[in-house]
Structure formats: structure tokens, C-alpha cells
């Protein structure tokens, strides 16, 4: 059986093999979407098909919405040719449940898939959709890189400069294309719309607004568009913030074989020339959270409660949910596992969770954070943390590696650990000196920077913009000689850039130095130190 609009009419055949077909009138919804489009989505990748498109499908099946989604792919046009067109815009979402069971469902809420290429006929159709008064929102999952218009040194990328010079006629960058389509909407009568970033980074709506506005301001300066276009962006276009949390790895061979055994044909995994790994199916974890700022000037779908843990709220709550995740309940645990996973030779996060010492370490990091957690009110931080420790991190079907998560650790330290230490320092009822697990992670990171694993062998370090600088301090320390530590860690541990506070001034610097010294006495000293600190029940 192949996946297409014809075969899904036989719902019983799909139900028989354990795949839930769509339960709404596709022809009717397609007709409505063509005439009165409400929702455009930029970036037709895995998290969109597995999570975002599924949220709308729920509403279609409940009769709460009557139009689907128009996808516009801005970056990798092969995705449209390989996994949208041949399968009539359908895909199979495979959710890996906590008990290891697979929940399978055909996602059919995408009614049109276009190439966001100004030299392709699809671009005219994209412009036509943006001129339609019915359009309520354009959401995006284009990865954080897609919003960047300048490099780390603050220089504009050459393609962005081209877009600024050429105006909205034939843009090449994602942000240039979004600005050009908004200009179409402006010319059609200043029609309102919300641009909703669903990419996983803080203050995502703010970043989207600033990139689109910067390009548009250059167009105004050069006389390529009317001055009022900026006024339109400020007054009639909303850029709501969001917090999204769901792990959707690349397509898995194991899931492909599982679907083929059920008799489903054509489940190939494609790697495009732009290195996108994509298939007609999506595999993902069960846990999910989506918190959206409720700012939609032209109305919106009935998103609240449209799926598990989907919330519409104010901007402050979105930011609190994001901070809860990145400072306490998920990201610090990830980094702790990344550091010790690299030192102890692990290749999978899920395998680390089988190590009682490492499981106890992340439980301890979570407990220390939860005392000062930012509580968003809509998500219970304790329940979120328990789900991360007991369900998400141990999931063997999510092939995440400590080496990948260890990338850019210097950029993550301030928010993932510094915020908690700072909060302990500022609270009269708490004392940073009583922290036990977070100092151990920081000592472990200093030990990691030596580039020697716990067996005493050289190990490759993950990319990090400050790596050279940090290595220059620890390179003077000799493995096997704790006394050679001397004052070499001081520039790292006193850095407010890294930890939000000077760790010596809050009573943690010396404690971390002592833990570090224990970890460099020789081979297997890291595990021994973990046993000593994590194995103890006292504070």
C-alpha cells in the first residue's frame, strides 16, 4: 500500500495495520483553503509535519476549523519534490510513547506545498495567498540560523546585502522573502497578520521582527518601497513569541523498517543536496510543549487545547516557560550529561541514564534548580522535571549524543548554571556554598577542557567559540599532578561572562578547584569523584 490521497479513502485498510487515517473531508478543506487561506507555514521540515501540522489536524477532525495549511519551503526546495508532491502532501507521524509503543497517524492538514523561490511559478501563488484578506497567520520553523542576517562580528551576510540592494522583487534569503511577501500584503491594503516563529530559541518573535524590519528599512532608504511599509510592520503585523519543546530527530532506519513490515511502500529516507535528512514519515518523542503569545491582529485558529500541552497566553508567561526549561528543568541536565558523557566515553544520552551515578547527578542538578525555578504557572515545573528525568532522557529511540550537546558549552553556562547560582546568592534564605551538584558539573567542565578522558586518553572536544581561550588556561595543568592546578582555573571561575557571578565571591571557586583536583589525580578519577560526591547522601 502506498501513501496517497486515493489509498487513504480506505480508512479500514489503514486502521487494520495500526495507522490512524485522517477523519475529515479533504476535498472540502482543500477547496476552502484555496479560496480562503488562513494559515501559511514557512519551512516544511520534520517538527512542522510531526507537531505543528498535527495540531491543526486535530482542529479539522473536531470540526473547529475548515481550512488547512499552505506550506512555503524557503531553503531546500528538494523537500517539496521528494516528500510532499509524490505523497500528495501527506506524511505519517510516528510518536514513540514512553512504553516503547509506536502511535502512527497520517497527517493530512497540508493542502498546498510551494517552493519559496522567486524564479519559480510557485512564487506568484505565494504572493497571491499573502494578498488574501482571509490570511490570519504565517508560522515559521526555519531553525535559528534562518533568522540571522549578520555574522557573529556584526557584518551583514553578502546575500542579505544583495536583498537589501535589490528590494522585494527577487529576494534570496529567508528573511528577505518574508519581508517581500509582507510587502505584498501591505500593498493589498495594509492587511493585518501575525508572523509566528515556532523555532526553539529565546525571544524568537523579537528576532524575527528585528531581521524583517532591518531589511525593510534599507528598502525604504533606497526608495524601493513606500515609507509607510515600516509603519505597517509596527502597527498591523504582530510577531508573537513562543516556546516550543519537542524532540524530533531525523528519520530513523528502524522506524522505516517498521512501516515497511506493515506493508507500506515508498518509505525511503532522502538526503537532499543541502544535507536535509527527510522522509515521508516523521519519528518523534511523546512529550511536547507549545506556549504561544496570544497576539493575532486578524484572528487565529482555536489553538488553545488543540493538543497536549498547547497554551495561548501573554508574552511574560511565554518567557517564563522558556526560562523554566533552559535554566532549570531540561537544558542544565542535558549539559551535565554532555560533559560527563564525553569524559566517561558514552555515545548516547539514553545510555548515560542507565548509569546510576549520572542519573543521580542530573536528579541533583534538577533539585538544586527547582528551589529557584521561574514558575510559568501554566506548566508545573516539578512535573516537567520528572518527565525529563524519567521519560525523555532515558528514551533509547532518540539518538542524541553527549558530543553534540557539548557544542558551545561556554555559551550555555551563564543561562544553564549561572542564573541558578546568582538566584541562590540573591536569596537571603539560600547560600550558594550549599550547592553540591552544580559545582561538580562546573568542575567536570574544567576537567573536560583538558581534552583527556577518564581513562587518560586524548579526546576530541566539541566546537566552542571560546575553546582556544579556555584551553590556554587549562593547558598549563598536568594530568596526574593536582598541585599543578595552581591559579590556572581562576580566570575561568571568576568570569561573570561565564557564570553571571564571580564564583570565588559567592564561595564556590575554591570548592570547584578542589573537585577539579580530585578529577585529575589519574585514570578513572572522574568516576571516583562522582562516586564520592554523588554517592554521599549528605549535602
Curated annotation (Swiss-Prot):
EC number: 1.1.1.57
Annotated InterPro entries: 6-PGluconate_DH-like_C_sf, 6PGD_dom2, Mannitol_DH/Oxidoreductase, Mannitol_DH_C, Mannitol_DH_N, NAD(P)-bd_dom_sf
Alphabetically ordered keywords of this record: NAD, Oxidoreductase
Superkingdom field: Bacteria
Record's catalysed reaction(s): D-mannonate + NAD(+) = keto-D-fructuronate + NADH + H(+)
Pathway noted in the entry: Carbohydrate metabolism
Residue positions binding NAD(+): 39-50
Keyword NAD on entry: yes
UniProt-recorded Gene Ontology molecular function terms: fructuronate reductase activity; oxidoreductase activity, acting on the CH-OH group of donors, NAD or NADP as acceptor
Family classification: Belongs to the mannitol dehydrogenase family. UxuB subfamily.
Main function: Catalyzes the reduction of D-fructuronate (D-FruA) to D-mannonate (D-ManA).
PANTHER family named in the record: MANNITOL DEHYDROGENASE 2-RELATED, MANNITOL DEHYDROGENASE DSF1-RELATED
Name of protein: D-mannonate oxidoreductase
Native organism taxonomy: Bacteria, Thermotogati, Thermotogota, Thermotogae, Thermotogales
Gene name of this polypeptide: uxuB
Amino acid at each position: 500500500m502506498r501513501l496517497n490521497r486515493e489509498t487513504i479513502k480506505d480508512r479500514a485498510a489503514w486502521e487494520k495495520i495500526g495507522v490512524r487515517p485522517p477523519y475529515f473531508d479533504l476535498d472540502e478543506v482543500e477547496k476552502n483553503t484555496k479560496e480562503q487561506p488562513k494559515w501559511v507555514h514557512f519551512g516544511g521540515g520534520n517538527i512542522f509535519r510531526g507537531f505543528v501540522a498535527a495540531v491543526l489536524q486535530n482542529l479539522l477532525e473536531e470540526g473547529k476549523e475548515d481550512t488547512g495549511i499552505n506550506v512555503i519551503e524557503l531553503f531546500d526546495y528538494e523537500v517539496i519534490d521528494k516528500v510532499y508532491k509524490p505523497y500528495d502532501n501527506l506524511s505519517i507521524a510516528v510518536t514513540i510513547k514512553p512504553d516503547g509503543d509506536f502511535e502512527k497517524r497520517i497527517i493530512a492538514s497540508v493542502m498546498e506545498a510551494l517552493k519559496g523561490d522567486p524564479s519559480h511559478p510557485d512564487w506568484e501563488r505565494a504572493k497571491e495567498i499573502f494578498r488574501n484578506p482571509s490570511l490570519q497567520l504565517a508560522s515559521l520553523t526555519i531553525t535559528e540560523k534562518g533568522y540571522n542576517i549578520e555574522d557573529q562580528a556584526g557584518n551583514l551576510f553578502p546575500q542579505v546585502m544583495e536583498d537589501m540592494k535589490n528590494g522585494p522583487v527577487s529576494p534570496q534569503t529567508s528573511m528577505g522573502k518574508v519581508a517581500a511577501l509582507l510587502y505584498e500584503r501591505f500593498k493589498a491594503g495594509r492587511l493585518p497578520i501575525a508572523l509566528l516563529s515556532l523555532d526553539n530559541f529565546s525571544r524568537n518573535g523579537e528576532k524575527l521582527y528585528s531581521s524583517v524590519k532591518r531589511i525593510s528599512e534599507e528598502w525604504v532608504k533606497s526608495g524601493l518601497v513606500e515609507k509607510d511599509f515600516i509603519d505597517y510592520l509596527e502597527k498591523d503585523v504582530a510577531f508573537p513569541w513562543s516556546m516550543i519543546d519537542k524532540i524530533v530527530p531525523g528519520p530513523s532506519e528502524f522506524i522505516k523498517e517498521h512501516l515497511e513490515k506493515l506493508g507500506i511502500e515508498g518509505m525511503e529516507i532522502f538526503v537532499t543536496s543541502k544535507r536535509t535528512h527527510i522522509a515521508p514519515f516523521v519519528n518523534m518523542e511523546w512529550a511536547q510543549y507549545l506556549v504561544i503569545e496570544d497576539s493575532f491582529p486578524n484572528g487565529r485558529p482555536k489553538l488553545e487545547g488543540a493538543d497536549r500541552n498547547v497554551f495561548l497566553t501573554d508574552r511574560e508567561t511565554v518567557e517564563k516557560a522558556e526560562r523554566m526549561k533552559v535554566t532549570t528543568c531540561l537544558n542544565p541536565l542535558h549539559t551535565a550529561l554532555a560533559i560527563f558523557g564525553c569524559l566517561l566515553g558514552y555515545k548516547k544520552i539514553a545510555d548515560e541514564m542507565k548509569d546510576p551515578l549520572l542519573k543521580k547527578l542530573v536528579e541533583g542538578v534538577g533539585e538544586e534548580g527547582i528551589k529557584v525555578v521561574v514558575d510559568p504557572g501554566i506548566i508545573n515545573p516539578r512535573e516537567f522535571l520528572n518527565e525529563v528525568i524519567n521519560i525523555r532522557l532515558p528514551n533509547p529511540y532518540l539518538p542524541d549524543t553527549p558530543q553534540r550537546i557539548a557544542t558551545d558549552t561556554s555559551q550555555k553556562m551563564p543561562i544553564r548554571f549561572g542564573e541558578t547560582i546568582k538566584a541562590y546568592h540573591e536569596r537571603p534564605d539560600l547560600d550558594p556554598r550549599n550547592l553540591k551538584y552544580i559545582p561538580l558539573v562546573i568542575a567536570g567542565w574544567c576537567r573536560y577542557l583538558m581534552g583527556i578522558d577518564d581513562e587518560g586518553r586524548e579526546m576530541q572536544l566539541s566546537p566552542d567559540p571560546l575553546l582556544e581561550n579556555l584551553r590556554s588556561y587549562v593547558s598549563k595543568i598536568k594530568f596526574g599532578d593536582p598541585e599543578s592546578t595552581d591559579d590556572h582555573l581562576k580566570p575561568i571561575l571568576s568570569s561573570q561572562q561565564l557564570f553571571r557571578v564571580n564564583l570565588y565571591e559567592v564561595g564556590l571557586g575554591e570548592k570547584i578547584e578542589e573537585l577539579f583536583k580530585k578529577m585529575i589525580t589519574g585514570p578513572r578519577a572522574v568516576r571516583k569523584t562522582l562516586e564520592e560526591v554523588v554517592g554521599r547522601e549528605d549535602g
